[in-house]
UniProtKB/Swiss-Prot annotation:
Record NCBIfam families: L3_bact
Record keywords: Ribonucleoprotein, Ribosomal protein, RNA-binding, rRNA-binding
Biological function: One of the primary rRNA binding proteins, it binds directly near the 3'-end of the 23S rRNA, where it nucleates assembly of the 50S subunit.
MF term (GO), any: rRNA binding
SUPFAM superfamilies in the cross-refs: Translation proteins
Full protein name: Large ribosomal subunit protein uL3
Complexes and interactors: Part of the 50S ribosomal subunit. Forms a cluster with proteins L14 and L19.
A GO cellular component entry from the record: cytosolic large ribosomal subunit
A Pfam cross-reference name: Ribosomal_L3
Signal peptide: none
Length: 223
C-alpha cells in the first residue's frame, strides 16, 4: 500500500493531444513528513503516519509538540496514518513524484460537503407524493415499515446530510506537476475547496495504464 496527503484546490479541465476534454480536480500535494512508523512488534499492525501543511507552534499543545519533535518536524495541520504502508523512516520527507506516476489509479478519501438538515427527497432521492390539493402528504417520507415498537437501524429518514467521510475509488491520475506540487485527478473528489484529502493506491481491479498526453497550449500559440 502507498499513499499521500493533499489539499483539494478546485476543478478545471484539460485537453489531450487528440483534442479530448478531460474534467480534472487540482490537488495540491505539499511534501509529506513521516511523523510515526508503526510496526507489528510495537503497535500490532503496520502503518505510517503522515503530516502535511505547517501550522503555528502556539496552536499546538505540549504532547502534540513533543510528537512532532520526535520526527524533527514542524507542527502539521493535517495528520493521518495509512495502514500497510512500509519502507519509510521517521522524519523522512515524501514528495508526490516519489509515490505516484501519471496513469495510475487511486482511491481518494475526504469529508463531503455538509448540506445541513435535509428531508427524504433530497437526502435519499425519495419520490415525491401527490401534489394535488386533497392528498394527505407531499414531501413526507410515508410509511416507516411494519407495525413494530421501534424503527429499524439504517432506516432512510430525514437528517443531517453530508459532512461525512467518503471515498471515491479508481480515479485516474492525469498529470503530476512536481515543481508546483500539483496533481491532476480525473473527475470529482469528496470535499469542498481547500479541504484535505487522502490519496491512496487503489484496492480494486483497475490497473495502471499509459499516461495521457496533454495538449501543449504554449506550443499551439507559438505555431
Amino acid at each position: 500500500m502507498k499513499g499521500i496527503l493533499g489539499r483539494k484546490v478546485e476543478m478545471t479541465q484539460v485537453f489531450t493531444s487528440a483534442g479530448q476534454l478531460v474534467p480534472v480536480t487540482v490537488v495540491e500535494v505539499l511534501p509529506n513528513t513521516v511523523l510515526q512508523v508503526k510496526t507489528i512488534d510495537s503497535d500490532g499492525y503496520v502503518a505510517v503516519q503522515l503530516g502535511t501543511t505547517d501550522k503555528r507552534v502556539n496552536l499546538v499543545n505540549k504532547p502534540e509538540l513533543g510528537h512532532f519533535k520526535k520526527a524533527n518536524s514542524n507542527p502539521k495541520r493535517f495528520v493521518k496514518e495509512i495502514r500497510n504502508m512500509q519502507g519509510y523512516e521517521l522524519g523522512q520527507v515524501i514528495n508526490v513524484s516519489d509515490i505516484f506516476v501519471s496513469g495510475e489509479y487511486v482511491d481518494v478519501t475526504g469529508i463531503s460537503k455538509g448540506k445541513g438538515f435535509a428531508g427524504g427527497i433530497k437526502r435519499h432521492n425519495y419520490a415525491r407524493g401527490p401534489m394535488a390539493h386533497g392528498s394527505g402528504y407531499h414531501r413526507g417520507i410515508g410509511s416507516m415499515g411494519a407495525i413494530i415498537n421501534r424503527i429499524f437501524k439504517s432506516k432512510k429518514m430525514p437528517g443531517h446530510m453530508g459532512n461525512a467521510k467518503r471515498t471515491i475509488q479508481n480515479l485516474e491520475i492525469i498529470a503530476i506537476d512536481q515543481p508546483n506540487n500539483i496533481m491532476l485527478i480525473k473527475g470529482s473528489i469528496p470535499g469542498s475547496k481547500n479541504s484535505f484529502v487522502q490519496i491512496k493506491q487503489n484496492i480494486k481491479g483497475m490497473s495502471s495504464k499509459q499516461a495521457v498526453e496533454l495538449l501543449n497550449r504554449n506550443a499551439s500559440i507559438e505555431a
